[in-house]
From Swiss-Prot:
Disulfide bonds: none annotated. Residues 159-340 are annotated as: NBD1. ATP 2 binds at G605, P606, T607, G608, V609, G610, K611, T612. Part of a stress-induced multi-chaperone system, it is involved in the recovery of the cell from heat-induced damage, in cooperation with DnaK, DnaJ and GrpE. Acts before DnaK, in the processing of protein aggregates. Protein binding stimulates the ATPase activity; ATP hydrolysis unfolds the denatured protein aggregates, which probably helps expose new hydrophobic binding sites on the surface of ClpB-bound aggregates, contributing to the solubilization and refolding of denatured protein aggregates by DnaK. Homohexamer. The oligomerization is ATP-dependent. It comes from Vibrio vulnificus (strain CMCP6). Keywords: ATP-binding, Chaperone, Coiled coil, Cytoplasm, Nucleotide-binding, Repeat, Stress response. Residues 3-146 form the Clp R domain. ATP 1 binds at G206, E207, P208, G209, V210, G211, K212, T213. NCBIfam families: chaperone_ClpB, PRK10865.1. One of its GO terms (molecular function) is ATP binding. Residues 766-857 are annotated as: C-terminal. This is Chaperone protein ClpB. Residues 6-71 are annotated as: Repeat 1.
């Protein structure tokens, strides 16, 4: 008997039977071994056959195990296992049956047919189960669908639809699909195309996240509810699983063979099946090797003839990139465009999905949370589509609330840690016997008892609240199940069951839920069971970094005292500080224009007066870190072509994939301070790019993505007019300086650029008093740096006045002061520390001696 006459599945089963005999110390491979191997095989071809024949496979398997146990065992045979004479006779019988049926190969089901004719114990068992040759032959015909076994892989290609597709109508019947709200026009258009005689293949096109797959799920739900035209009633919607189709196709042509078997089975169904191909573009080029066809080309004939009812779904970009390049494939599909829903439509969709998410997370989702999710995601998440981004917010907010319920509340956790800490201290003190330790131990025991009592009370409250929450959850789950049962009864036409549920079980559960909810409504101290708009805002803030949550009292207080905080570091610039503070307050109060940046400012004035320092202080105030500022030195953008560095190189140029310096920074941190330093040094064309940012708060990068600047503060600094200030400094007051500077600025910048800037602020030149205050700030920083190295520093008033005098230069601002501190204080101190003349941990005083600042210890 040649092994290559068997199908590949049958060959694997024979190898498994050999292993089974070897493992059980049997000398011969009997038909029972092979039958067990066939039943245990992964993707067994025998199991579906026995299911059709109404055989209890588990009962059969246990009977076969008993037969194996009765076979004689021979120990120490050294791994020599042979085919028994019964097995040889069985194979010959299989060959005879295969020839009779005109099969080129012997398949697994032929062995079952031969086993029934067997006079041995296996044949006897099948007779007891009521199997006859006629019954098995009919079942084989049903499974094969009239096909002969002309290929070694024939068994793997059988029931291709079950293996390579997912039945959406079946899932809809089981209530596993989410409800589809709205989208009536798109579903109607899809049905309209499916009803055509030829080219009845809609392709649903839209941006990622607008609900393309949901439309097909909606179609499946309408089919099972009989809400479709006569022509589509009773149809099945099958989703093609491309992963299963490609997985394990090792040899050339195997993928095509699988796809062909799917198409053959579809054609046999004669239009009763609608095939849904999600990510349709994956079909173009799938399975393409040198000289072989791809899946897209194999689909074309069936699509054109109208044999295959196919619904595709893909994004706009991928449709253009893959489908439109193949006009022959494109003309076979009819486009159904799906737009992003409006905020109002999204709210309706979320209300429909609300119950599913409540049931999954075991929390309650309030209506304000739904409205907030739709409106906030629409405003602040610009690079994704509704309703997907709004559903994400609801899902994550519900998940965070659930996590708080399941894990210990923060108050309880802190108390537990404190008790552990006190117990460790108690253990350490119990070994000490001096008076102080005993006194401390007594007070510690009192504190520990107090904390443990507090912990016990809180834990009791927590457990009671958890129990209350889980009670409502069980009722909600039962109510959902009752509603699903009612839907099944409606479809089955079981009126008595429907009335029992509608007028008995469901109202009773709703009443129970009301009572449980009222009990739960009593103010909970530890747990929250509701997703409100606050939770949605918190999740959005974590995702994007944009503060949209309601302000706490501390933050309101901080914003009202913003000028005070900024003035601690920025000296003598009242107007500039006020302008910036007002812009931030407008934004946080929600009054700023939603289509423009939070604020855009042009800071002008002489060098060294605090223009850049104000930006750093603002970033520090808003984000507690100066690094949160996106700083771009415009002196690097002097050439015309360097503009591309800001938004990214255009296609075809080197660096296209990398993205722009400015756009990438803002995409990662949508809420930030952008500082364009020394803006007048840049090429004039750079300002053309800034026009869109300042006016509409948006910019398109080199890859065509729109970057949102609406949550940024744009600050530009410039030294324009500083030469005039130097020339006329002694003669002019602040108003005169401002006029001179503005004259130069209006000549240099275009009017459309200046007109778009919210505020143009000219900084004051610094006076002697300002320099003294700045000197105090600078010396304080120096003292902090020295403190870290163990050298405490104290500066006398005279030393402060002297350094302020030395560092004062009305033209150059505060920068000469920095140099003066370096030369007069830092350099001598560094020498003293290295020489060892000043000692660590001993105060160093800076005093004035002969108009010189000296360090004294």
């Amino acid at each position: 008997m040649r092994l290559d006459r068997f199908t590949s599945k049958f060959q694997i089963a024979i190898s498994d039977a050999q292993s089974l005999a070897l493992g059980r110390d049997h000398q011969y491979i009997e038909p029972v071994h092979l039958m067990v191997a066939l039943l245990d095989q992964n993707g067994s071809p025998i199991r579906p056959l026995l299911t059709i024949l109404n055989v209890d496979v588990t009962h059969l398997r246990s009977k076969l195990s008993e037969m194996l146990d009765r076979l004689p065992k021979v120990s120490g045979i050294g791994g020599d296992v042979q085919l028994s004479s019964a097995m040889g006779a069985m194979f010959n019988l299989c060959d005879k049956i295969a020839q009779k049926r005109q099969d080129a190969y012997i398949s697994s089901e032929i062995f079952l047919l031969a086993a029934i004719e067997d006079r041995g114990p296996l044949g006897q068992l099948f007779k007891e189960l009521g199997l006859t040759e006629q019954k098995v032959s009919q079942a084989i015909e049903q499974i094969r669908g009239g096909q002969k076994v002309n290929d070694q892989n024939a068994e793997e290609l059988r029931q291709a639809l079950e293996k390579f597709t997912i039945d959406l109508t079946e899932r809809a019947e089981q209530g596993k699909l989410d409800p589809v709200i709205g989208r009536d026009d798109e579903i109607r258009r899809t049905i309209q195309v499916l009803q055509r005689r030829t080219k009845n293949n809609p392709v649903i096109i839209g941006e990622p996240g607008v609900g393309k797959t949901a439309i097909v799920e909606g179609l499946a739900q309408r089919i099972i509810n009989n809400e479709v035209p006569e022509g589509l009633r009773g149809r099945r919607v099958l989703s093609l699983d491309m992963g299963a189709l490609v997985a394990g196709a090792k040899y050339r042509g195997e993928f095509e063979e699988r796809l062909k078997s799917v198409l053959n089975e579809l054609s046999k169904e004669e239009g009763n099946i609608i095939l849904f191909i999600d990510e349709l573009h994956t079909m173009v080029g799938a399975g393409k090797g040198e000289g072989s066809m791809d899946a897209g080309n194999m689909l074309k004939p069936a699509l054109a003839r109208g044999e295959l009812h196919c619904v595709g779904a893909t994004t706009l970009d991928e449709y253009r990139q893959y489908i439109e390049k193949d006009p022959a494939l494109e003309r076979r599909f009819q486009k159904v465009l799906v737009d992003e829903p409006t905020v109002e439509d999204t709210i309706a969709i979320l209300r429909g999905l609300k119950e599913r998410y409540e049931l999954h997370h075991h929390v309650e989702i309030t209506d304000p949370a739904i409205v907030a999710a739709a409106s906030l995601s629409h405003r602040y998440v610009s690079d994704r589509q509704l309703p997907d981004k709004a559903i994400d917010l609801i899902d994550e907010a519900a998940s965070s609330i659930r996590m708080q319920i399941d894990s210990k509340p923060e108050a309880l956790d802190k108390l537990e840690r404190k008790i552990i800490q006190l117990k460790i201290e108690q253990q350490a003190l119990s070994n000490e016997h001096d008076e102080a330790s005993e006194k401390r131990l007594r007070s510690l025991n009192e504190e520990l008892n107090e904390k443990e009592r507090e912990f016990a009370e809180l834990e009791e409250i927590w457990n009671a609240e958890k129990a209350a929450l889980s009670g409502t959850q069980h009722i909600k789950a039962a109510l959902e199940q009752a509603r699903m049962d009612m839907e099944f009864a409606r479809r089955a036409g079981d009126l008595s069951r429907m009335s029992e549920l509608q007028y008995g079980r469901i109202p009773e559960l709703e009443k129970q839920l009301d009572l449980a909810t009222q009990a739960e409504m009593q103010e909970m101290t530890l747990l929250k069971n509701k997703v409100t708009d606050n939770e949605i805002a918190e999740v959005l803030s974590k995702q994007t970094g944009i503060p949209v949550s309601k302000m706490l009292e501390a933050e309101k207080e901080k914003l009202l005292r913003m000028e005070e905080v900024l003035h601690k570091r920025v000296i003598g610039q009242k107007e500039a500080v006020e302008v910036v503070a007002n812009a931030i307050r407008r934004s946080r109060a929600g009054l700023s224009d939603p289509n423009k940046p939070i604020g855009s400012f042009l800071f002008l004035g002489p060098t060294g007066v605090g223009k850049t320092e104000l930006c750093k202080t603002l970033a520090n105030f808003m984000f507690d870190s100066e690094d949160a500022m996106v700083r771009i030195d415009m002196s690097e953008f002097m050439e015309k072509h360097s503009v591309a560095r800001l938004v990214g190189a255009p296609p075809g140029y080197v660096g296209y994939e990398e993205g722009g310096y400015l756009t990438e920074a803002v995409r990662r941190k949508p809420y930030s301070v952008i500082l364009l330093d020394e803006v007048e040094k840049a090429h004039p064309d750079v300002f053309n790019i800034l026009l869109q940012v300042l006016d509409d708060g948006r910019l398109t990068d080199g890859q065509g993505r729109t970057v949102d600047f609406r949550n940024t503060v744009v600050i530009m600094t410039s030294n324009l007019g500083s030469s005039r200030i130097q020339e006329n400094f002694a003669m002019l007051d602040y108003q005169g300086i401002k006029e001179q500077v503005m004259e130069v600025v209006t000549k240099h910048f275009r009017p459309e650029f200046l007109n778009r800037v919210d505020e143009t602020v000219v900084f004051h030149p610094l006076g002697q008093d300002h320099i003294k205050s700045i000197a105090a700030i600078q010396l304080n920083r120096l003292a902090n740096r020295m403190e870290e190295h163990g050298y405490p520093l104290e500066v006398s008033d005279k030393a402060l006045e002297l350094i302020a005098q030395v560092g004062f230069d009305p033209v150059y601002g505060a920068r000469p002061l920095k140099r003066a501190i370096q030369q007069s204080i830092e350099n001598p101190l560094a020498k003293s520390i290295l020489a060892g003349s000043v000692l660590p941990d001993k105060k160093i005083q800076l005093i004035v001696n002969n108009d010189q600042i000296v360090a004294h210890q």
